[in-house]
C-alpha cells in the first residue's frame, strides 16, 4: 500500500526483554542490524501487521509479548533509488511507519528466525536500549532515533531510560548463525 505521497505503510517493532534490553536482528547475508519491520497489507490494521511481522521475523506469537505502546504519528524515511525495486521507482519515496514497543513475556528460546522460507535475519542479540546506530543502514537511522526517543517515555519512570542517553554503546558483530545461541546474544 503506497500512499499518494509515495510512502509505503509499514510497522516497526522495538522488542524489550525483562532487563529492558532491545532485540536486534542481523539482516540475512548483510552486515547491518535492524529492528523487525514490514509492510501493512491491504485490509490490515497496524496492530495486525505488527503481530504478523513479529511472527514471520522472530517466530513470536501474541501470547509471547505485551504491547507497551506505539508512536502517535507515522514516522517516515526516504529510500535511496538504488535500494528501490525498479518497478516502484516512479511512485515510491520510502516508508511511513507506526512503531510498537513490546515487552517479551516468553523466553529467549521462543525466538525462531527460521519461520519462513526466506528469513529476514540470520542472527539476533539483546543490546542496551540506547546504542550507536552505525550498524543500521544510514537512511533508517533518523527514524530509529525518533522511534526510540518517543517510545522511551513509556520506560523513563520504570527503568531510568531518560532521553539524554544518546546512542553510546555500539552494536558489536557476532558470528553468523541461523539459530540463536549464547554466542549470538548479549546476556
Swiss-Prot record:
Keywords: Hydrolase. PROSITE patterns: NUDIX (PS51462), NUDIX_BOX (PS00893). Its EC number is 3.6.1.-. Residues 6-149 form the Nudix hydrolase domain. CDD domains: NUDIX_Ap4A_hydrolase_plant_like (cd03671). It comes from the Bacteria. GO terms for molecular function: pyrophosphatase activity. A motif (Nudix box) lies at residues 38-59. Residues 166-187 are annotated as: Disordered. Its cofactor is a divalent metal cation. The keyword Repeat does not apply. InterPro entries: Nudix_hydrolase (IPR020476), NUDIX_hydrolase-like_dom_sf (IPR015797), NUDIX_hydrolase_CS (IPR020084), NUDIX_hydrolase_dom (IPR000086), RppH (IPR022927). Accelerates the degradation of transcripts by removing pyrophosphate from the 5'-end of triphosphorylated RNA, leading to a more labile monophosphorylated state that can stimulate subsequent ribonuclease cleavage. Belongs to the Nudix hydrolase family. RppH subfamily. This is RNA pyrophosphohydrolase. The lineage of its organism: Bacteria, Pseudomonadati, Pseudomonadota, Betaproteobacteria, Nitrosomonadales. The gene is rppH.
Amino acid at each position: 500500500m503506497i500512499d499518494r505521497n509515495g510512502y509505503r505503510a509499514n510497522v516497526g517493532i522495538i522488542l524489550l526483554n525483562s532487563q529492558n534490553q532491545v532485540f536486534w536482528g542481523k539482516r540475512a547475508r548483510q552486515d547491518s542490524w535492524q529492528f523487525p519491520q514490514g509492510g501493512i497489507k491491504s485490509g490490515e490494521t497496524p496492530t495486525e501487521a505488527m503481530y504478523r511481522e513479529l511472527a514471520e521475523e522472530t517466530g513470536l506469537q501474541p501470547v509471547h509479548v505485551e504491547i507497551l505502546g506505539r508512536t502517535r504519528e507515522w514516522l517516515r524515511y526516504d529510500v535511496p533509488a538504488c535500494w528501490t525495486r525498479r518497478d516502484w521507482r516512479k511512485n515510491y519515496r520510502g516508508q511511513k511507519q507506526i512503531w510498537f514497543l513490546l515487552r517479551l513475556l516468553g523466553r529467549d528460546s521462543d525466538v525462531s528466525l527460521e519461520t519462513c522460507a526466506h528469513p529476514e535475519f540470520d542472527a539476533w542479540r539483546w543490546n542496551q536500549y540506547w546504542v550507536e546506530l552505525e550498524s543500521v543502514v544510514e537512511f533508517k537511522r533518523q527514524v530509529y532515533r525518533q522511534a526510540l526517543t518517543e517510545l522511551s517515555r513509556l520506560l523513563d519512570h520504570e527503568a531510568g531510560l531518560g532521553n539524554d542517553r544518546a546512542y553510546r554503546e555500539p552494536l558489536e558483530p557476532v558470528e553468523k548463525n541461523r539459530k540463536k545461541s549464547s554466542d549470538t546474544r548479549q546476556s
